[in-house]
From Swiss-Prot:
Keywords, in A-Z order: Acyltransferase, Heme biosynthesis, Pyridoxal phosphate, Transferase
Lineage: Bacteria, Pseudomonadati, Pseudomonadota, Alphaproteobacteria, Rickettsiales
Subunit structure: Homodimer.
UniProt keyword annotation of Secreted present: no
Organism: Rickettsia prowazekii (strain Madrid E)
Name of the protein this chain belongs to: 5-aminolevulinate synthase
N6-(pyridoxal phosphate)lysine: residues bearing it: K244
């Protein structure tokens, strides 16, 4: 193994030298004290958790999970085709179809798998399909399109003019699909969804939208930005996750019966893996149902988002201005981004994970702040003042959100 160890060590050392080495934080989350956690025997406040609404610890969700555990056991027992098609997952798929006003849904083990295997399978099902993909689409989308080996065009981030130019270059009668996200997880920008829908109609293309960072958070029932804009019925495939606002695990797609059935019969990421256990699918169903009926969590969430952005404006903290709940603070240097994150955690008891390349482009390294309804005014002030002190110590310039927004957005779409 010594020869291969040398190769592995060289690879690791290169990543370390670039300030990109990732270390796991050993955390003990506290279900009864969200958003606190325990880290190295001290209590910390979590500001980067994707459990957007704290639904993982909601009493309805936890009780549903406990009941399912006692009724069905821990595991699912197999793949969906062989012993693992528990009634709980069928109920979940009905709930998801209703959420997005679609005929049916298909659940996967993760959002990554849902994107990857669905997109790759569409190329098997639809001969000569051409993909049109936003340049900042998630790695799971990129992986699915790449493994499809289909013809593809990548359009500039959020640039519908460039997208149309690319669509014009392909025969109108050739099958096409436009793949995009409703909200981009690293910059928080929303896609021009209605403009993309109009282009899809004009150029005879299917639409595939990734709503993982918006389901549960936007829309009357939590159906995401497409529900908020009342255009769910104009999008062919809506993909989402159960692992963020809904507080569980898993991914899904929703569409019409024929498309979903074709994916069900084709996608290896669905066919050849054990299904979600009933304890998870039952919890997810109850989480979705609660957020369909309750708007309280969404309202409180938006209030905290607004308060945090206002605080950052007040302290001149350089966040990337957007309309969403995702609040990136651009550092622009991997070493400094790591230092800021470590100082927040070790000196102030605040956990914000730094985001470096390859997750974001080089030169746009950042912290990504994720507010929840449980974050208090004191927590907001503590985070803001800690950042000001750390920026001063590390000689990181404070600048207004408006100024930075122009500079960084040009960098992102160049």
């Amino acid at each position: 193994m010594s020869y291969y160890d040398t190769i592995f060590n060289k690879h690791i050392d290169k990543i370390k030298s670039e300030g990109r080495y990732r270390e796991f934080k050993s955390l003990k989350r506290q279900a009864d004290n969200f958003p606190f956690a325990e880290y190295e025997d001290k209590q910390i406040v979590m500001w980067c958790i994707n459990d957007y609404l704290g639904m993982s610890k909601h009493v309805k969700v936890m009780q549903a999970s406990i009941d399912a555990l006692l009724k069905y056991g821990v595991g699912s027992g197999g793949t969906r085709n062989i012993g693992g098609n528990n009634i709980s997952i069928l109920e979940l798929e009905k709930e998801l179809a209703d959420l997005h006003s679609k005929e049916t849904a298909l659940v996967f083990t993760s959002g990554f798998v849902a994107n990857d295997t669905t997109l790759a399978s569409l190329a098997k099902i639809i001969p000569d399909i051409v993909f049109f993909s936003d340049e900042l689409n998630h790695a799971s989308i990129i992986a699915g399109i790449k493994s499809s080996r289909a013809e593809k065009y990548v359009y500039r981030h959020l640039d519908v003019q460039h997208l149309e130019k690319l669509l014009q270059s392909v025969d109108i009668n050739k099958p096409k699909i436009i793949v995009f996200e409703s909200a981009y997880s690293m910059d928080g920008f929303f896609s021009p969804i209605k403009d993309i829908i109009n282009l899809a109609k004009k150029y005879n293309a299917l639409t595939f939208i990734d709503e993982v960072h918006t389901v549960g958070l936007y829309g009357k029932q939590g159906g995401g930005i497409s529900e908020l804009l009342d255009c769910s019925n104009q999008i062919d495939i809506i993909q989402g996750t159960l692992a963020k606002a809904y507080g569980t695990i898993g991914g899904y797609i929703t569409s019409n019966y024929n498309l979903i059935d074709a994916i069900r019969l084709t996608a290896p990421g669905f066919i050849f893996t054990t299904s979600l256990p009933p304890v998870i699918s039952t919890a997810a169903t109850h989480s979705i149902r609660h957020l369909k009926e309750s708007n309280e969590e969404r309202i409180k969430h938006q209030e905290v988002v607004t308060k945090l952005k206002n605080s950052f404006e007040h302290f001149n903290i350089p966040y990337l201005k957007n309309e969403s709940h995702i609040i990136p603070i651009i550092i622009g240097d991997p070493i400094k981004a790591t230092k800021v994150s470590n100082m927040l955690l070790n000196e102030y008891g605040i956990y914000v994970q730094h985001i470096n390349f390859p997750t974001v482009p080089r030169g746009t390294e950042r912290l990504r702040i994720i507010p929840t309804p449980a974050h208090t005014d004191k927590m907001i002030n503590d985070l803001s003042t800690a950042l000001v002190h750390i920026f001063d110590e590390l000689d990181i310039e404070l600048s207004s959100a408006k100024e930075l927004n122009k500079e960084v957005r040009l960098h992102l779409i160049a």
